[in-house]
């Protein structure tokens, strides 16, 4: 499908609610030594800090045929020619991703702000650039953007980092003036901010004191809040803390997003459907909107190559696994 080039004002669409939208996560974390960001092969590199045959963090190689700007890597294609990758820092990379969203019917993205990177000058500069480019391309193609704070790696006391950052973003992008920033996602009449990583039992360095401060702080500023929680948040088992404060904090928020990645595969998903339906009942009874996660499958063999045990991902099966989840969740949310 050919896409005509139209003036930005004609492309702009106002996003007033998350309801009915299909949103993707957008990490924007890939770097190259020559992209100007001084982060080396960030997220491409293996555990030893190098990106080369035998040391990498990725299992899938990107098809870069449509990218305007690419970078030669230490890898070779089967024909002996150099293999190229993209950088998330480049405006042309982000623009292509939003063009694809328009082409394939994806409504927008949650652009992640990793709290741990906000304290690292090069990391902050990189993700500031990614967000700038995303806001520009979202407006160009009529797509939605929502900021998501990923708390992974955060320490106690870093809640101030989150609240200070969103204050700066609100001024920079006019988040509370929807006519001036129509591409920013609103929900329940307010700009939406996502906070991912509340209630997990994997030994994090922050707790409910910090997450409550973030949620209450965002609410006091006038935001709606989406909270990302473990898959088993309702029963508080398996991947979830057994602490009543989790449910209390979920009830403070506008939207609940459980993390289902890796919690089932194509064979076990049919049995997981009841879990989602029970989640939805709880959310409705407590006046919280519910957003289930669908994922296409993945492999992380190289990411976990340092571990002795064989690491198995979730087979994609040519899209059948993804379609199974989408069909169920779209049908149940009509």
Stretches found by the model and what they are:
Residues 1-10:
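Bacterial Sec-dependent N-terminal signal peptides
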Residues 10-334:
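Glycan-processing catalytic domains of CAZymes
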């Amino acid at each position: 499908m050919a896409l005509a080039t139209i003036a930005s004002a004609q492309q702009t669409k106002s996003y007033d609610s998350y309801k009915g939208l299909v949103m993707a996560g957008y990490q924007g974390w890939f770097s190259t030594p020559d992209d100007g960001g001084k982060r080396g092969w960030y997220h491409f590199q293996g555990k030893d800090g190098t990106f080369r045959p035998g040391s990498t963090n990725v299992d899938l190689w990107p098809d870069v045929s449509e990218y305007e700007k690419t970078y030669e890597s230490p890898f070779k294609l089967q024909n002996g020619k150099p293999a190229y990758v993209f950088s998330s820092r480049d405006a042309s990379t982000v623009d292509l991703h939003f063009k694809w969203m328009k082409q394939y019917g994806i409504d927008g993205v949650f652009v992640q702000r990793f709290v741990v990177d906000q304290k690292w000058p090069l990391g902050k500069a990189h993700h500031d650039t990614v967000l700038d480019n995303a806001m520009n391309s979202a407006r160009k193609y009529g797509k939605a953007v929502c900021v998501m704070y990923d708390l992974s790696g955060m320490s106690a006391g870093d809640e101030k980092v989150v609240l200070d950052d969103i204050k700066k973003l609100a001024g920079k992008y006019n988040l509370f003036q929807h006519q001036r920033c129509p591409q920013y996602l609103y929900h329940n009449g307010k700009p939406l901010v996502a906070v991912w990583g509340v209630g997990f039992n994997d030994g994090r360095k922050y707790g409910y004191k910090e997450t409550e401060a973030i949620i209450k702080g965002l609410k006091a500023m006038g935001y709606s809040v989406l909270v990302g929680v473990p898959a088993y948040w309702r029963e508080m088992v398996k991947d979830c803390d057994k602490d009543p404060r989790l449910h209390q904090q979920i009830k403070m928020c506008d939207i609940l997003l459980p993390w289902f990645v890796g919690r089932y595969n194509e064979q076990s998903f049919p049995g997981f459907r009841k879990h989602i339906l029970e989640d939805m009942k709880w959310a409705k009874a407590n006046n919280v909107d519910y957003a289930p996660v669908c994922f296409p499958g993945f492999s992380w063999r190289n990411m976990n190559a340092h571990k002795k045990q064989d690491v198995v991902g979730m087979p994609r099966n040519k899209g059948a696994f993804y379609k199974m989840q989408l069909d169920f969740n779209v049908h149940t949310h009509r």
